[in-house]
Swiss-Prot record:
UniProt tissue specificity: High levels in brain and fibroblasts.
Disulphide-bridged cysteine pairs: none
A Gene Ontology BP annotation from the UniProt entry: intracellular protein transport
Binding site for Zn(2+): C61, C66, C85, C88
Entry GO MF terms: zinc ion binding
Protein name: Protein transport protein Sec23A
Amino acid sequence: MTTYLEFIQQNEERDGVRFSWNVWPSSRLEATRMVVPVAALFTPLKERPDLPPIQYEPVLCSRTTCRAVLNPLCQVDYRAKLWACNFCYQRNQFPPTYAGISELNQPAELLPQFSSIEYVVLRGPQMPLIFLYVVDTCIEDEDLQALKESMQMSLSLLPPTALVGLITFGRMVQVHELGCEGISKSYVFRGTKDLSAKQLQEMLGLSKVPVTQATRGPQVQQPPPSNRFLQPVQKIDMNLTDLLGELQRDPWPVPQGKRPLRSSGVALSIAVGLLECTFPNTGARIMMFIGGPATQGPGMVVGDELKTPIRSWHDIEKDNAKYVKKGTKHFEALANRAATTGHVIDIYACALDQTGLLEMKCCPNLTGGYMVMGDSFNTSLFKQTFQRVFTKDIHGQFKMGFGGTLEIKTSREIKISGAIGPCVSLNSKGPCVSENEIGTGGTCQWKICGLSPTTTLAIYFEVVNQHNAPIPQGGRGAVQFVTQYQHSSGQRRIRVTTIARNWADAQTQIQNIAASFDQEAAAILMARLAIYRAETEEGPDVLRWLDRQLIRLCQKFGEYHKDDPNSFRFSETFSLYPQFMFHLRRSPFLQVFNNSPDESSYYRHHFMRQDLTQSLIMIQPILYAYSFSGPPEPVLLDSSSILADRILLMDTFFQILIYHGETIAQWRKSGYQDMPEYENFRHLLQAPVDDAQEILHSRFPMPRYIDTEHGGSQARFLLSKVNPSQTHNNMYAWGQESGAPILTDDVSLQVFMDHLKKLAVSSAA
């Protein structure tokens, strides 16, 4: 018998699914008392090298309101060649191609190990991938040079049939015509005036070609006139490389004390409009590179006077940020237009000050695009992160999917409340849609324009079975995830994942339900919900809501005597959950103090799309200790772990930090590592560096690398993350010298837990 931990792990590896509960309460009333909803983290394109795509199309249920895909949970009558849908119980005839099936000769989609399966749609044309570069030229020469080199590098990684386009912007916006031999030709637009797709179509002479023509198969080899701005790489590789090399800084003079006039809002609007007119519903990626905030035209986020700083959280709270609402509205409209046509928007922002990510965040968030934030385009952090966008799989294909749609089907006793992640609603009302919305709800279909192997959505469900309608013994609830997308090879693919979980009566089998709790998944699902609320609610209100949910969970599943906090016990399945909540409350996802609005938007963007493992690291960073007393070991994220004779490696997802304890730092300063007799010290110093390099080489986006020591200014990154179990207030009461006192008034995990226990056992609660 496998344990729940093994069961959870197997399901994640096979199906890319993690549920908060792995046995479901069988009535609506009992489900609401569980505090944490029945919900799942789902990674649609979870990498499965052992799962080759199948070269035929899925068999669908014939009932028009169902259309579920044949799967291992369906009952099959091999003699009559019939199958019964496990969602609506409709009996269906197998298509003629299945005439040879039997108990001994089953198609792959009926085998239990293929609960996830990928089909290749052989109908329809194969479309090329489209990459449209949108480049800010109001940046320093050194930065611009580095950016040009990165873009030239990316051209060499694109498939030869991919179409590319180039738009540059400063005070004006230039759309470059790429088909001209020996001459640079571009259309110039004013950066202060927005254009509709129709106006753009007429101005660029795109209106002569019907939209349908641009999406038919033969047109790919013979690009229509509308492709003057989007040309195959193999045809214009040299020209575009030269054109990029010749790009100059924006020529408009910038007076003293002023910011350059930058028309980011209009540039992005033209990019969205260009793709809308020429290639709707085809996999396309707008890659926008910005080196500062928009200072004119629609979408501007700050004026051009340098003495007026860009908005802070304080300004926003005091309603003193005059451009935020208007700027956000402009970019939201663009994000929705791009999402409708299935196009992805990436934003690569590199500057020392804010660039307006707060206002622009909806563009990558709604289209499944990337958001990358750095100090300069001339850093390895940007260069390597950008290179990783073009990572390829073992078959030499990009690890990116385009124009995805996710449809979810459920059994009758459960409905879908909504999804939180990089998606937009397709407003598809079906029988399995709940009236209680969580996140993007009121639909059973979502559009995910850009997908990577780690893109993960949080899906929330509602048990609707009534209390007085018992589910038969041994009954199971089922959910089917159907993801259709354009593979980077140009093929349309459909990945189908079908899972089932047992029902249990919460009044008689509460132990079974409690034992099935996945505390890691639950923590991330509740965190996504809290961050989603934080976008529209006051920070303290969100923290209070989170605390209330935690107290209720402790009251429901803890073991205790009324009014006796010392008697409180949590079973192993719940024991880490309060600790996750403690670190979540202190995290930059919910605490905006000390972070700019752009930084908060950046952190939240990544949390809302990453898989479970990476999300857990973001909430509760991992700490490893290196010392002479043994091999490297994971240690508690606690101030007591900071010792003089230790090196610590902390991974927060966004940063990799190496911290040298006081003694180690002194030895390093004295140069002992360079003396042959202290070779073991040299190895000790090198070990965390090697481990850090491994993480730096594989993660997207590449983390910031920090090397610091006791008393170093950057040690603050470590001190702000660890649990302050020893502070300047209690350090002398411990009667020992271990650990480092943290100068903070924040409560420690111990104090937090004591308060939690007191509130959970209180009879007044």
